[in-house]
Amino acid sequence: MKTRFKLTFPQNLIKEPVIFTMAKKYDIIPNIRRAKITATFGEMILELEGGEDNIQKGIEFISQQGVDVELVEGDILE
């Protein structure tokens, strides 16, 4: 299963390996489709591939870390 999300990172998480930790912990393959990172915030379109339960747990994990997560429906322009 592949699902896309828009992630918004607060300043204190920009340099933290949140995506790596989630992917490793929940056996998810992340694919960064688009990203914009500045000194004060980060925004990313992330495609996650894995089991439905694992993706759900991974999203809950990064949300608990302080990342704002929104489901992206439909196609993203490349």
Name each region found by the language model.
Residues 1-43, 47-78:
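Long, contiguous binding/interaction regions
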